[in-house]
Amino acid sequence: MKRIFISLFFFAFMWTAAGADASPELLFVRWPANPDAVWYSFRIVPVTQHFGRKEMRPPIYEDGHVFRDSVMIEKEITDSYDGPGILCCQVKAIGLDGQSISAYSAPVPMEKAAQEMERYAPKIRVKYHEQNGTVLLYPAYSFVKIPHAVSYEVEITDEEPENPDGCEPSVHRILQGIVTIPELFDELPRQGTVWWRVRGLDENGGPVGVWSEAEKIVNDPAENWETGILGDSISHGGGRMSYSPADWPYNYAYYLDFPTINMSRSGDKTEDLLRRFDADVLPFHVRYLLIMGGTNNLRCGGTAEEVISDLEALQEKCRSGGIEPVLLTIPPIAPERILKYYHQPTAENWKAEFDKVNGWIRTQTHIDTAAPFAMYEDMPENLAADGLHPDKEAKEKMGKIINEKFPEIRKKISETKIQK
């Protein structure tokens, strides 16, 4: 498994540092994200004035499939324009089925909206470890694409790269991956400190420009995390097909009142959680572990008994390691949309099996994260567009109920220990 409004349109501006002798070649434009958008259509239009009225001419540049809320274009596009009017940019939000879900925004002059980028390289979109919900043991590397690149090489290093302005691999490389979309999910846990960066590649695999600036990720057991999260992609984060775990508003941990280290991994079944527990969870010596799992088992034909057995084993592992397990109930899914977007059938008895697992979880130390959706047979489209991954609003609801119930659980656990 995998993944404000434009009517109040204003642009956020960002710089990327580069070498002193570099000349600006790219323009970077970013706009406030529409949480319902899957992608955007971006265009540059000349705007003229006649008798005080603005008139828009045909676009000089248009990209109908911009991934997420920012774009980079070549500066030459605007520099070479010698026609009438002022060049302005507009965006509109596109939905899951390719339909427009907003009108084009009001035109904003490019001289205000665009930032010159002196490094011809992809731009890293997110920073880790800055606020609640932004610490992932399994990172997602997300970036903004550049013109002329047909694929991208993501490099992970165990020391800061020695060639920040080059295009050769670092001598400190520990992993690399090639992608055609602007993100890569790490399949391995990143414990300790690593750096990552990305460069564009042409159709022959040669470099387009240079490496992006390297970003540091720290997942240090010495930071003494009190609370961890273990689960599949519902806990890992992401949603609405195009948003990854690095898009923090699509992660319920982002809405929590307390810091967490997220040890979840997209695609996991409960047996996977059990298998990687010792290596991924124990080194961090957390006091509490929020556990959600079973969705992938049950939708693919697994039984409630198998899931419950794995969850019981996870509870035992936690207690043996001095960790208090807190189980989370699993929210409903929508099989029709899972089939439509992922071409995966769902077991016909999924609902009954979900109910069995959630019924058992409610007899344990738990938080009922499925409760906000109890009135639905299937998860509605506005809460999980793809039928599988809860979107921003649903993640907020899950975070809210965890915030409400977790202090009570902590208090009860403390009182029980005192009595003993």
Description of each model-found segment:
Residues 96-116, 203-219:
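Extracellular fibronectin type III
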Residues 26-36, 137-148:
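Conserved aromatic anchor
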Residues 79-99, 188-204:
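Beta-strand-rich modules
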Residues 43-86, 156-189:
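Recognizes extended acidic, P/S/T-rich segments that occur
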Residues 335-371:
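Substrate-gating cap/lid alpha-helix
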Residues 273, 365, 382-420:
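Histidine-centered active-site loop/cap adjacent to the catalytic His
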Residues 206-266, 275-285:
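Serine-esterase "nucleophile elbow" of acetyl-processing enzymes
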Residues 242-243, 249, 270-310, 331-335:
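Oxyanion-hole/transition-state-stabilizing segment in secreted/luminal serine hydrolases
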